[in-house]
Design a protein with these regions (language model features):
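ER/Golgi luminal nucleotide-sugar-dependent glycosyltransferases, focusing on the catalytic module
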Residues: 2-270
Length: 270
């Protein structure tokens, strides 16, 4: 798709002839925020976000879906990476949600799926450290994807989604998944875990395969339903349903493709 709006990517100084660092986890942000900085954590501006204090790479005229940002949210960044990223390793996180690849600096050894940390220099140093990068790269020698530890619900993925977002989106999503993978999508009626945030790290080829499959499913649903303005009966912002169904898609994709995944805590910045 070609968007009429803009999507901006904030990139660090060039470190190789292609113009990209060899390894990058892109940090999606739609506003000015204090972020951990390193040669492998790369802010990417969504929804037309600009920051005059850093280098900004405009995608004007390039293949993007920035005009869908209200509904697709962080998926607009994921689409931009699919079309333009040339890193040796690629990942996506958010300005308040980061993956951690080494134990957090805290005494609790039973880390939850989501680990809150204060927004301090010490936290940023920890998240952007070489130790994190090296551990991440070593994990990718063994695993296909690094993903957040899953959120575990007392009910199935299907039931929890319908309770939160309603049956309309779920029904269309299941039909689209069946178009992509075949009739059997019983995974959702058996699994109680899901990977939140559309957050991951992987290799370029595995990313491209995943992203193309994801957008075939999500775009088909959006083509049927379009932008949803108001649904009083659902709990969360209904216009963001493409992002919500994408979160559930990741678990199904991992299951169907038989991928090896490493599940790691997600840091939530207070």
């Amino acid at each position: 798709m070609n968007g009429m709006a803009k999507i901006a990517a904030v990139v660090p100084p060039v470190t190789d002839p292609r113009g990209f660092p060899s390894m990058a986890v892109y940090v999606a942000t739609h506003k000015r925020a204090t972020l951990p900085r390193s040669d492998w954590l790369t802010p990417i501006g969504l929804n037309g976000y600009r920051d005059e204090n850093v280098r900004t790479c405009d995608a004007d005229g390039a293949d993007n879906i920035a005009h869908l940002n209200r509904s697709y949210v962080e998926l607009t960044g994921l689409y931009w990476l699919l079309k333009h990223c040339r890193d040796d390793y690629v990942g996506l996180c958010h300005y308040r949600r980061f993956l951690t690849f080494t134990p957090p600096p805290a005494p609790d050894i039973n880390y939850p799926a989501v680990f809150p940390m204060d927004t301090t220099d010490e936290t940023f140093d920890y998240l952007a450290s070489d130790e994190q990068k090296n551990r991440m790269l070593s994990l990718l020698d063994t695993y296909d994807f690094i993903v957040p530890r899953p959120i575990i619900y007392p009910e199935t993925v299907a039931t929890s989604f319908v309770n939160a977002h309603g049956e309309l989106f779920w029904d269309r999503f299941l039909r689209s998944c069946q178009r992509e993978f075949g009739h059997d999508v019983s995974y959702f009626d058996q699994e109680t875990r899901f990977y939140c945030g559309n957050i991951f790290v992987t290799t370029p080829e595995k990313f491209r395969q995943f992203a193309k499959s994801l957008f075939r499913v999500v775009d088909h649903v959006y083509a049927e339903l379009g932008e949803i303005e108001d649904m009083p009966e659902v709990r969360y912002a209904p216009h963001r349903y493409p992002g919500y169904i994408a979160e559930r898609f990741m678990g199904l994709y991992i299951h169907k493709m038989g991928l090896r995944v490493f599940e790691t805590p997600m840091v939530w910045l207070n």
